[in-house]
Amino acid sequence: MDFFYIGVMSGSSLDGIDIALLKQDDRSRLLATHYIPMPEDLHAELLGLCSSGVDELARAAIAEQKWCRLVAQGVQTLLEDQNMVPAQIRAIGSHGQTIRHEPARGYSIQIGNPALLAELTEITVVSDFRRRDIAAGGQGAPLVPAFHEALFDDNKDHRAVLNIGGFSNLSLIESDRPVEGFDCGPGNVLLDAWIQSQRHESYDKDGEWAASGEVDQALLQKLLSDQFFLTKGPKSTGREVFNLGWVHHHLFQLPTLTPEDVQATLLELTALTITESLQSAQAITKELLVCGGGAHNKALMKRLAELLPDTEVSSTEKFGVDPDWVEAMAFAWLAHCCLEGVPANRPTVTGAKGRRVLGAIYPA
């Protein structure tokens, strides 16, 4: 039986909200998309909630209402563009906006007011996907490897899927064993933060600014000494660890570097932590499929190909899947799994004690 779902994803980059319409039968098919750029004031509010501050509970409650109303408007626009009505959609899978991710302390917080979203859209909402996995002893992240497995597993071995959003995570796909996956470290988060602080630009288009600089080995080695990179998976991370303050901490006591050299070094950090993670976890990788915003960073993609000479590095576009929409598709699929009672976490990815059905349901 065919079902229609809507997936909503707002990632750690805080640049915008992705809304995807999915047709789900024996496979997942992307039918339409809608993108909402994050308003500057809401971006600032959400970024502020990622670290300790004053009156956080009230600020979070207000911010999530703004976020939710934006999403509801986007869902309405998407449906109108497709000449569809809410009754045709089985559910919205809403990730919400992560403001804290501390699995070692037993919590991950996503705001988004799914009750209000169900009320505004008149569509059942499935949300709160991470906490059940954490309750079962897992990291609560990454959750997309199970979807990567469903989408890209065609019984070929030695394939990996790399998502480069604010943070980078890998899914390792082999035909004879369960999918494995983990966070590698910063994806775009430090690159975006640095160029925003130095040039007041939202991101480094094509990695051109990074390509204009030189990698500083002293800084690179200091960055690579972080405990996260020395820890074996399952593991996940977030802005609590990797942020602009973390960069400034490591720049302290180093000779003055040009801003573009810092950017080049941050790009090298992203590329190295991805390739080293991949090589240590999967002896042979014939094919690396890249999705997320980082797939458009030409300098980063070029560097990954250089570091992985025996691996074909390409965008998920090769499979006819737009790299910008894989995560939003994943949360539509996770909503489907929840309503069907299908466990969607992978203990080989998160470290949970077992398979669990993920998500909380807010009926229309």
Curated annotation (Swiss-Prot):
SUPFAM superfamilies documented for this protein: Actin-like ATPase domain (SSF53067)
Keyword terms of this UniProt record: ATP-binding, Carbohydrate metabolism, Kinase, Nucleotide-binding, Transferase
Domain of life: Bacteria
Membrane spanning stretches: none
Record-listed ATP binding positions: 11-18
Example of a GO MF term: kinase activity
Catalysed reaction, written as an equation: 1,6-anhydro-N-acetyl-beta-muramate + ATP + H2O = N-acetyl-D-muramate 6-phosphate + ADP + H(+)
EC number: 2.7.1.170
Metabolic or biological pathway, per its Swiss-Prot or TrEMBL entry: Amino-sugar metabolism; 1,6-anhydro-N-acetylmuramate degradation; Cell wall biogenesis; peptidoglycan recycling
Functional note: Catalyzes the specific phosphorylation of 1,6-anhydro-N-acetylmuramic acid (anhMurNAc) with the simultaneous cleavage of the 1,6-anhydro ring, generating MurNAc-6-P. Is required for the utilization of anhMurNAc either imported from the medium or derived from its own cell wall murein, and thus plays a role in cell wall recycling.
Protein family (similarity comment): Belongs to the anhydro-N-acetylmuramic acid kinase family.
CDD domains cross-referenced by the UniProt entry: ASKHA_NBD_ANMK
GO biological process, one term: 1,6-anhydro-N-acetyl-beta-muramic acid catabolic process
Protein name per UniProt: Anhydro-N-acetylmuramic acid kinase
